[in-house]
Structure formats: C-alpha cells, structure tokens
C-alpha cells in the first residue's frame, strides 16, 4: 500500500510542533507506561491492560516489519526537538475489510494540546500524497468523544454506528464509523494548510538531537 519512500526507517514527518518517526526498540518503556494506562488502553481494540513488558518489544518489531513491507505506516509521535521521547502513536493499516484505516493513541500527560489532531492530519496528508488510495476509514468507541473530535477536525464524515470486536477488552463494543475521501481532504487543506505537513523527508534522513 505504501511506497518505497516510507519503507525506510529514516522516514519521518514534521508538523508545526511534532516529529513523527518510526518506533524504535528504545521506545518500549514509554509505550508500556503510556499505552498501558487504563484511560488509554480501554478505548482501543488491541492494547492490553496492564501492558506486559514483552508485548512492547513485540509490537515495535511487528510495526517496523509492517512499515518495511509497505503494508502499513505507523509512526511514533514526538515533540519537535525531542524525537527520542515518544508521547503516542499514529498509524494507517488495512482493517478486516481490507480498507485503509487510521488509528492513534496519546499518553494522558499530552492530552488537551491538539497533538492527536496534528499528528493525524500529517499522516493523512502523507497517505493521500504517497498512495493511490481514495478513501480512509476510522472507528471509535461511542464513549470516546475526544477521538471523535479528532476525526471530525480531520474532515472525517460520520457513516453510522455498529459493533466491533475489541480483542484486548474481551468482547464486542458499540462504535461509531467515519470515512474521509481524497476530495474532502483536498478541500480541508485548501482552507487549513498550516496544520498539515510542513516538511517531508530530506535525503539525509537525520533527526535533530534531543
């Protein structure tokens, strides 16, 4: 789904306040600490709580492999100038219906600053720039208004409600489904360009020092 450009671990995206990069094995402790919080994990389908230490390294390995194979693009969210300090994740992969789907999580210390929206917009922009896909989907639990607001601010349109299996939660839960197409994204960019990707990868692939 993704081209050769994104399949190298020097690939990153820059926004006004964030650097998005491939996850590294050094991110394991941050993932365990932040993703493992109940407030974060309970809104996701696959993040366990508590988060087993060995699961973090496995997640990083599998994520990097999927990125390298072009099957997905999942990036660590870091603050600009602090690229070694993971604060969350954002990624796009195909769901069970083989549709490209975006997902994200942010550690609770970073809530309330608009980082999730900023990161999601950057990855959405890259998705439409670097792939030939015309639509992107997402789902959120009905009890997660914060995630719904992120999707709405990214231009997603509500498609309806349904049920979805949350393996890590051990059951099926009500969700709201959203969809964004290429035309709607182009319209959003036309009046909100400052929130999109500011600079795409450079040839040297270097990240600034932390």
Model-derived features: where do they sit?
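A generic secondary-structure signal
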Residues: 62-63, 126
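Short loop/turn motifs at secondary-structure junctions and domain boundaries
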Residues: 65-71
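Short, well-ordered strand-loop elements centered on a beta-strand within folded domains, enriched
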Residues: 64-65, 102
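Conserved GNAT-fold acetyl-CoA-binding loop/helix
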Residues: 39-62, 73-75
């Amino acid at each position: 789904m993704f081209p050769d450009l994104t399949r190298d671990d020097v690939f990153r995206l820059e926004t006004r306040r964030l650097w998005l990069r491939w996850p590294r094995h050094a991110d394991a402790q941050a993932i365990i600490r932040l993703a493992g919080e109940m407030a974060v994990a309970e809104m996701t389908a696959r993040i366990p709580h508590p988060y087993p230490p060995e699961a973090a390294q496995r997640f990083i390995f599998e994520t990097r492999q999927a990125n390298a194979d072009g099957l997905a693009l999942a990036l660590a969210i870091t603050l600009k100038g602090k690229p070694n300090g993971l604060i969350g994740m954002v990624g796009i992969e195909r769901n069970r219906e083989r549709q490209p789907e975006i997902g994200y999580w942010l550690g609770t210390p970073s809530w309330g600053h608009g980082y999730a929206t900023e990161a999601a917009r950057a990855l959405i922009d890259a998705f439409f720039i670097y792939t030939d896909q015309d639509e992107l989907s997402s789902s959120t639990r009905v009890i997660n208004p914060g995630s719904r607001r992120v999707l709405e601010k990214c231009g997603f349109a509500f498609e309806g409600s349904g049920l979805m299996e949350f393996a890590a939660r051990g059951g099926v839960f009500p969700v709201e489904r959203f969809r964004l197409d290429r035309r709607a994204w182009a319209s959003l960019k036309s009046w909100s360009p400052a929130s999109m990707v500011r600079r795409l990868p450079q040839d040297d692939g270097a990240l600034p020092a932390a």
